[in-house]
């Protein structure tokens, strides 16, 4: 099965040996996206809602480059640093997925960047 590497312009360089997304058989696998700028610095430090918005906008950009959109997302893997941020994250998340929401799970973890409050990885069928 051939795969296509998705490297959208403007996304930060990966922090490890991975790519922002791969596409195979019309399925796009988006790597865990952190709230990072083009220099891999965390944006909106301390603001879970703004970080969530940044992450979802990045995922939207990646999916667009793969020929899809957020409407094509079938599963999200959500990693958050603190359960106290869960309501703010969900409020923003609901704006991006108002109807026909994808399946998801959400777990509390330590993230690779200490100031990051959220990371989301997605699967989309385009």
From Swiss-Prot:
The keyword 4Fe-4S does not apply. The keyword Cytoplasm does not apply. It is an enzyme of class 3 (hydrolase). InterPro entries: RutC (IPR019898), RutC-like_sf (IPR035959), YjgF/YER057c/UK114 (IPR006175). Gene3D superfamilies: RutC-like. GO terms for cellular component: cytosol. GO terms for molecular function: deaminase activity. Pfam families: Ribonuc_L-PSP. CDD domains: YjgF_YER057c_UK114_family. SUPFAM superfamilies: YjgF-like. It catalyses: (Z)-3-aminoacrylate + H2O + H(+) = 3-oxopropanoate + NH4(+). Keywords: Hydrolase. GO terms for biological process: nitrogen utilization; uracil catabolic process. Its EC number is 3.5.-.-. It comes from the Bacteria. Signal peptide: none annotated. Involved in pyrimidine catabolism. Catalyzes the deamination of 3-aminoacrylate to malonic semialdehyde, a reaction that can also occur spontaneously. RutC may facilitate the reaction and modulate the metabolic fitness, rather than catalyzing essential functions. Belongs to the RutC family. This is 3-aminoacrylate deaminase RutC. It comes from Acinetobacter baylyi (strain ATCC 33305 / BD413 / ADP1).
